[in-house]
Amino acid sequence: MKLKYSLLFTIIVCTILFAQPKPTPNSSEIKLALKKLDLLGSVLYIAAHPDDENTAVISYLAKGKLLRTGYLSLTRGDGGQNLIGTEQSEQLGVLRTQELLEARKRDGGEQFFTRAIDFGYTKSSEETFEFWDKEKVLSDIVWVIRKFRPDIIITRFPSTGEGGHGHHTASAILALEAFDLANDPKAFPEQLKYVNVWKPKRVFWNAWLPALQKQQMDLSKIPSLNLGEFNSLLGKSYTEISALSRSMHKSQGFGSSGIRNTILNYFMLQKGDSVVNDMFEGIDLSWNGVEGGDEIHT
């Protein structure tokens, strides 16, 4: 009898849940989506774990620059902490996957993964590659680049080891290698039955200001974005949107409050076409490159 009532209760609850209407976009979100149709540019942000991504950069690119913006997390965070439950390992990876998907709903990005496993902390990329099948993870990154077709790739960490975690350094190393291989038909040719080769224009490192200052870099010559800008259409700054996104990483205790201020992020060119001040310099983000596209305006 108890089983009967339990099943009945489950059916009723599921019926109620699935009957809930989808959130209705407000007029500002609809207008933003229409404006976004005017642009074809895309950016792929790459790092190692859920919560590594700079949600302010993703928010700015997706809702400010109106570009198709993706985050490629090489792992699903199986080796992280869990401050809200008892799930660990694969179950924690499932939980953190959902947290990433919820974060993207708020900052406007798209989410991608590779088969890499978060097996815990490592000191170096060499140690990381002893556990990861480097060639398979690299093929996954190349696949995402060929399918997503980004104009620009941004890495969260440098490839030179200052990221504080072997996974972090490995993610940057693999991103730089994939940048070259994605346009090589000899690299992972089995993918070409489904996608075409693709050549992004540039790879940037989302550099840390203290690291640049330590090297006495001339910041005026490094492309930057003001992530604290206010979006009058949405009524929020991009850092406020970012806070809503980052707060979805509940298992990691990563809630944050939004602010409005000048918050500059700098982007160091790692590979690709040279640039002076604008990350998108020389890249046509309009429909002009598409046959008949000059007639398309929203």
Q: Which functions belong to the PLM regions below?
A:
Residues M1-P21:
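Bacterial Sec-dependent N-terminal signal peptides
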Residues Q20-K147, T169, I173-D180, D184, ...:
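Active-site rim/loop-helix segments in enzyme catalytic domains that contact anionic ligands
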Residues P21-K22, E29, L181-T298:
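The feature marks non-catalytic terminal segments
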Residues D51, I117, P158-T160, L209:
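Catalytic metal-binding/acid-base residues of hydrolase active sites
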Residues T75-D78, S159, L209-L212:
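Short loop/turn segments at secondary-structure transitions that flank enzyme active sites
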Residues F113, I154-T155, R202-A207:
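A structural signal for short, well-ordered beta-strand segments and their strand-loop junctions
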Residues F148-G161:
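Short acidic, glycine-rich surface-loop motifs adjacent to enzyme active sites
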Residues G161-S171:
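Active-site loop-helix segments enriched in His/Asp/Glu that coordinate
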